[in-house]
Amino acid sequence: MASLHLGLSSIPRPSFRPTCNLIIRCSAERQALFNRIAPVYDNLNDLLSLGQHRIWKRMAISWSGAKEGDNALDICCGSGDLTFLLSERVGPRGKAVGLDFSNEQLLIASTRQKLRSKTCYKNIKWMEGNALELPFPDSSFDAVTIGYGLRNVVDRHKAMAEICRVLKPGSMVSVLDFNKSINPLSTAIQELMIDNIVVSVASGYGLENEYKYLKSSIKDFLTGNELEKLALEVGFSNAKHFEIGFGFMGNLVAIR
């Protein structure tokens, strides 16, 4: 029977970095934000992407290299979309772990699991945890995914280093997120859509301020080239970023 473990700290412990207090405060604020949007998160994803996010997520799973019998990890799993797809890939003989720092998102994921009948979904374990301090030994997983999560962590270098640490040599991580384009026109169109469509729709759910955060988070994110360099810096042997969704989305694939 699948389990829901909620005993892990979801706020980073102080580190040697001089900005550790700021990191803790920002992490707590982001955790609270995702708890607030949890009840309508799935509906908004479908509405705002016209269902296209499901295609992008299947592409991300394919790029992860997960296969039958594998031990796979989905970081920043939210309500579990990628975790369920990973579970289908690894099958009943494999294992899938969905980790997130939002208790509310995990409760929704666990509820969704109980309503689904596929045998493979019994191999899923939900955990509340911190992407900056993954609670797993080195070389634990055959595949890792992170969807729309790396952009939201407060220390991307540490998060990628942790992913590299828990992956087995030769295994891959697939990182799906909004694409920070270097094309001024693409950036302008993306921001226009966020301001006039995304925020407008979210305001109907009382979440205008929460989704205004999206534009600033993309501005603060890394370009495809920067993501590739980051992956190599933390120890991955190879990395390639792909633009998808008309260039508005991106997927980094990195090999341990």
Predicted regions mapped to residue ranges:
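N-terminal, positively charged/glycine-rich alpha-helical extensions of SAM-dependent methyltransferases
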Residues: 2, 10-42
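Class I SAM-dependent methyltransferase Rossmann-like catalytic core
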Residues: 38-52
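Class I SAM-dependent methyltransferase SAM/SAH-binding core
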Residues: 71-134
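A short SAM/SAH-binding and catalytic strip from SAM-dependent methyltransferases
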Residues: 142-156, 179
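A short glycine-rich, Lys/Arg-flanked "PGG" loop and its adjoining helix->strand segment in the class I
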Residues: 157-172
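Core SAM-dependent methyltransferase catalytic element
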Residues: 234-256
